[in-house]
């Protein structure tokens, strides 16, 4: 899920809200990672010219497992403490968008099959990413590995970005690592894109600051949310003919979608039964747990468990897996460890003015990895 054209719009109207950097600048930070985005990257990136992903001897896809293993090791070696957040059940308002994605994926698969049959490698390469999808089984495999590595995993009530944002608001994490810009719309003060422990010279990490966005644009949080709805989100349609710049200028002039609709020219077509109010409510009050008293725990590495899972069950190279485990075990002896001691003392982020005014109270999670569901 994302906000269409938001990054380009911010580059124009709030350029100071984004800064580029390298992974070592996040040493000593706790980062909430949108797990579905990360796993998708591994599934879509590690594919050959036949369209196949990395598989074991039984033909099972394994790129997401080994990719997560080495990426997590690199993050920890960089002095970062990652938390992985997995998607829960999507909101009903997203059903329409999910249906569109399914149809598009089916069309892309048909085009990919044709390109492969014709030997068009360039076209096939372009289509591979559009057909990559993370299954529940793959998600469970990644969770199992992370738990063996001692890394915290949280299954969100709803979408992962909302829970990542809630962790940042509660002061448990510094930033949300995702490619989806709606993490800002959901209230994450810091959002980092291109978050990789690899060499970032060609594609540096990009960090966005929500408070800087609001300061530079002069918008309130509610106005920023309305802007994002006008730009295009997964929860509802947009006004046809209203592009990014027009959307920004309309919010700047009229302050809210309600006022915009009262003054909007007839040349623009407003969707019938437009559910912008419901979309706004989902952004303002996402289905998340209350993390104010939540304690994040990084457990000891289960060395034998990792070997059994990766080598015995998944048939990865034992020597390489052992080297990875040794790197994890040796992190404490590195200089980065001195900075890790401050991880549990992250300051809490206070409620926004709108939340404070409305008396919002966020729900408390259970001590289990999975968030507690709302009581009916």
From Swiss-Prot:
> What are the binding positions for Mg(2+) 1 in this chain?
34, 87, 159, 161
> Which superkingdom does the taxonomy of this entry point to?
Eukaryota
Q: What is this protein called?
A: Flap endonuclease 1
Database matches in SUPFAM superfamilies: 5' to 3' exonuclease, C-terminal subdomain, PIN domain-like
UniProt region (N-domain), positions on chain: 1-105
Q: What segments bear the compositional bias annotation Basic residues?
A: 360-376
**Which segments carry the region annotation Interaction with PCNA?**
336-344
User: A single GO molecular function, which one?
Assistant: magnesium ion binding
UniProt region (I-domain), positions on chain = 123-254
Subunit structure, interactors included: Interacts with PCNA. Three molecules of FEN1 bind to one PCNA trimer with each molecule binding to one PCNA monomer. PCNA stimulates the nuclease activity without altering cleavage specificity.
PTM comment: Phosphorylated. Phosphorylation upon DNA damage induces relocalization to the nuclear plasma.
Q: Name one GO cellular component term.
A: nucleolus
Q: Which residues bind Mg(2+) 2?
A: 180, 182, 234
Lineage here is: Eukaryota, Amoebozoa, Evosea, Archamoebae, Mastigamoebida
Q: Where in the cell is it found?
A: Nucleus, Nucleolus; Nucleus, Nucleoplasm; Mitochondrion
